[in-house]
Amino acid sequence: MLLTRKNVAVRPARAARRDVRAMSLLGNLFGGGSKPTSSTSNFHQLSALDIDKKNVDFKSLNNRVVLVVNVASKUGLTAANYKEFATLLGKYPATDLTIVAFPCNQFGGQEPGTNAEIKAFASARGFSGAGALLMDKVDVNGANASPVYNFLKVAAGDTSDIGWNFGKFLVRPDGTVFGRYAPTTGPLSLEKYIVELINSR
């Protein structure tokens, strides 16, 4: 069936899933190369620049659950994910849950903006406050991938490329990786694991 403007508007989730499958296939064919490696043994040993180019030492996130996600502003999955991020941020204090969002422009060029534009976009959708860490734009796959993403893939036991925008990782309060989740997995569907990890401290 041809995707008309009406069809895309009525079924955005279905269209987004097709995008994810298509890009995953392209990634398998043309991306990748060598598998990522990491000498880091714990998420809390890492650091990265935030959206304002300030260094964030992840040991400051000790004893809280961390959801790491690669975000984009112009993706079919954007609206639903940011809405669910806002719901989680409204329910759990930063001392329980922090969402660490890395803008990435590797998938269809869907995060083309400047850091200032990305920050304004995220803030307007409720991604703000102490529990919302918006990071500097990074690559998540390939030779220039962020060391954070190399670590997450290795620690999760799945070194395949991130398939699309909004791939997710859950990190335990002790800095070990709990799980890796597909772009189509909504943030709220992970809430049961988030609560479990909060209560495990």
UniProtKB/Swiss-Prot annotation:
Residues at the active site: 75
Induction pattern: By selenium, particularly under autotrophic conditions. Repressed by photooxidative stress (by rose bengal).
Pfam families: GSHPx
Gene name for this UniProt entry: GPX
Lineage: Eukaryota, Viridiplantae, Chlorophyta, core chlorophytes, Chlorophyceae
One GO location term (cellular component): mitochondrion
GO BP annotations, alphabetical order: arachidonate metabolic process; lipoxygenase pathway; response to oxidative stress
Record field: catalytic activity: 2 glutathione + H2O2 = glutathione disulfide + 2 H2O
Keywords: Detoxification, Mitochondrion, Oxidoreductase, Peroxidase, Selenium, Selenocysteine, Transit peptide
Targeting signal (transit peptide) range: 1-27
Function: May constitute a glutathione peroxidase-like protective system against oxidative stresses. Hydrogen peroxide, tert-butyl hydroperoxide and cumene, but not phosphatidylcholine hydroperoxide, can act as acceptors.
Family of this protein: Belongs to the glutathione peroxidase family.
InterPro entries associated with the record: Glutathione_peroxidase, GPX_AS, GPX_CS, Thioredoxin-like_sf
Any one GO molecular-function label of the UniProt entry: glutathione peroxidase activity
Annotated EC: 1.11.1.9
Protein name: Glutathione peroxidase 1, mitochondrial
Top-level division of the source organism's lineage: Eukaryota
Location in or out of the cell: Mitochondrion
